[in-house]
């Protein structure tokens, strides 16, 4: 996994609105929001919110804004102000605005002024940072298709050991290390991007 893979997957979003809303809900859950209740991620009247939630016991609304290409601040601001109407409409204490857009600190402050400070803005960098936490690994895989090379390595090694235990891979005496065993161990200590290939190459050569 490259260091900016999560960021790039978010920036070049192709998942559509339903997936964006579900991913946004996961971000809120990771950031201390509770009672998250999506409204109509697959279409329909949403009552001015993509989801309802609570933060510190107070009602909040969520709005997800994911696009395939970057938007100018004017477009982001227009969307934010439109979603902001849902705060008063639903008697909420604030809005959690989750987006894949790059929004600078100064721009975020400008948006918060419209909300009288009652906003949490989860912009591209913040969302990527949350998703890159170790505990968010399954969420990255589910919504962004990002897998951990280590998982693939473990699977290849598990398959290799299973073949050995069934007697289908080695004709050498029990207790002696085979050439494949040595190659597997060596593969586990090199760069992660090379590990899978080395293990598979060792098995083919055996």
Q: What are these regions, as identified by a protein language model?
A:
Residues 1-206:
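Mixed-charge (Asp/Glu-Lys/Arg
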């Amino acid at each position: 996994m490259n260091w900016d893979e999560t960021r790039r997957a978010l920036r070049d979003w192709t998942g559509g609105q339903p997936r964006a809303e579900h991913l946004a809900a996961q971000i809120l859950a990771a950031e201390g929001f509770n009672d998250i209740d999506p409204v109509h991620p697959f279409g329909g009247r949403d009552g001015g919110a993509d989801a309802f939630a609570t933060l510190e016991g107070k009602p909040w609304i969520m709005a997800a804004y994911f696009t395939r290409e970057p938007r100018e601040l004017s477009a982001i601001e227009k969307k934010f102000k439109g979603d902001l109407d849902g705060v008063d409409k639903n008697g909420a204490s604030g809005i959690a605005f989750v987006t894949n857009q790059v929004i600078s600190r100064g721009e975020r402050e400008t948006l918060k002024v419209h909300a009288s400070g009652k906003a949490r803005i989860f912009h591209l960098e913040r969302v990527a940072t949350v998703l890159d936490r170790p505990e968010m690994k399954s969420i990255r895989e589910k919504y962004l298709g990002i897998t951990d090379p280590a998982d693939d390595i473990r699977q290849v090694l598990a398959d290799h050991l299973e073949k050995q235990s069934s007697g289908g891979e080695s004709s050498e005496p029990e207790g002696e290390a085979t050439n494949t065993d040595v190659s597997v161990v060596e593969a586990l200590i090199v760069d992660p991007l090379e590990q899978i290939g080395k293990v598979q190459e060792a098995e083919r050569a055996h």
